[in-house]
Amino acid sequence: MEVLATDTASQQERLQAIAEKRRKQAEIESKRRQLEDDRRQLQYLKSKALRERWLLEGTPSSASEGDEDMRKQMQEDEQKARGLEESITRLEKEIDVLEFGESAPAASKENSAAPSPGRPQSASPAKEEQKSETLVNAQQTPLGTPKENRTSTPVRSPGGSTMMKAAMYSVEITVEKDKVTGETRVLSSTTVLPRDPLPQGVKVYEDETKVVHAVDGIAENGIQPLSSSEVDELIHKADEVTLSEAGSTAGPAEPRGLAEDVTRTTPSRREITGVEAQPGEATSGPPGIQPGQEPPVTMVFMGYQNVEDEAETKKVLGLQDTIKAELVVIEDAATPREPAPLNGSAAELPATKEENQTGPTTTPSDTQDLDMKKPRCRCCSVM
């Protein structure tokens, strides 16, 4: 009977401990959600105050009614921001007390004070128990879960010694943040090997599986801790950027290969000198051209040259089997010849009298008058 009573009492104590632990976890989760909401609202108020201050700096010195209202609104926002900062500090302390017990504030005070060189520091039992439980949970995390900037983080073992938790990999994410709207945009994401020693940056987030450091832009943007929801959203955006980059690099590979195949299968174009294309022809082939079909070619000639194969040229130009017309002139031997024109064109011959034609003979003066009335043709001859 005593054994049964002891078992019943131990079981009740165990159930009470489990219920108390669940209650603490639920309270911690509630306070964490409230803490994240306060941080988000504080960030919004800071961005709003920065934008309003920038607008007020651009206005002239003469204050108007709208400027006064804006300044009053800025003062109210600053008061709200101070209240949110106090609330955030209080919630963080309450969460520390719930997680590590009543000894957490005392331990933080001891850590803030200068330690004596002769006395080694020993962690409290509640903190050691919590850290050991954190280590077990970190080891049970599946390998496929997304992580970001996971670095070597010291974890205290139950014996009080510091043990390094090895990082599996590290991710470098380049982020651009809009100061007006507060929206975060991921520019690039690169997976690298975990770096040892730790990166030269400021720690802005840490939990059982992830540690986030702000490396660049600290002087411009300031140090702002991140919440778990913001870290998860950042990891999700980084995964989307990585997938989009992989798709953009793998997409154009297939059309390039098809273009190379078409180039190989297309026969070489035959060039015929002296052929002019039609005015309606295009400089490139149609978009739906099939391999093996020769697209139209447009050629523009800025001069001429002698062709070696004259027969082929006549055949192409349609001059084969044509009749050449010759000019036959019958004249008297006494008619003076005029010099040939300089441009090589055929000279205009004066009208002569045929042998069996009857009529008055022409005098030299009449011939000169005829030449003056009828000017000589100096047009160019083609072909």
From Swiss-Prot:
Propeptide: 381-383
Biased composition (Polar residues): 109-124, 133-143, 357-367
Record's GO cellular component terms: apicolateral plasma membrane; axon; basolateral plasma membrane; cytoplasm; dendritic spine; filopodium; filopodium membrane; neuron spine
Modified residues (N-acetylmethionine): 1
Bias type Basic and acidic residues, positions: 69-96, 257-273
Phosphothreonine: modified positions: 141, 145, 153, 242, 361-363, 367
PANTHER family, alphabetized: PARALEMMIN-1 (PTHR10498:SF6), PARALEMMIN-RELATED (PTHR10498)
Quaternary structure annotation from Swiss-Prot or TrEMBL: Interacts with dopamine receptor DRD3.
Protein name per Swiss-Prot or TrEMBL: Paralemmin-1
Source species of the chain: Mus musculus (Mouse)
